[in-house]
Amino acid sequence: MNMININYNNEPRKKLIDKNSHLRIMTDFLLTKEKPVILEFGVERGLSTNIFIWLAEQVGGKVYSIDIDDCSKVATSEHWQFLQSDDLKIEYILSKFPEIKELGVDLIYIDSYHENFHVQKLIMLWFKYLKKEGAIFIDDIDSEP
């Protein structure tokens, strides 16, 4: 594994990316990839988005974020593209981000609608665009009664 060394000790990242956080696990995984491509479903305030962008800026990666709400102002970067859309509208999203279809993604992060059937649909739709040795991370799934 060829891992790039990144300094996690700069504020505010130090608190956000402690050794055991899901953000640290994802960034450590992404550092094993050359110019990682990240597909993020769910932005809200942009916490994970900004961590992904920070990493992409360090290593020449790319972040594609989709949210049903307009979250376009949570960040600004040449390494980030945002699309306001339902994350199940795969054809529309791919028409706006054709690079996903052409090149694939290293990491899919699902943090949009947390209902288990929605998460299942997302995985079924987007799995084929995941690169070999890529990963899917899911934040908070509602359990059934």
Regions found by a protein language model. Give the residues of each.
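A short alpha-helical cap/connector motif
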Residues: 1-109, 113-145
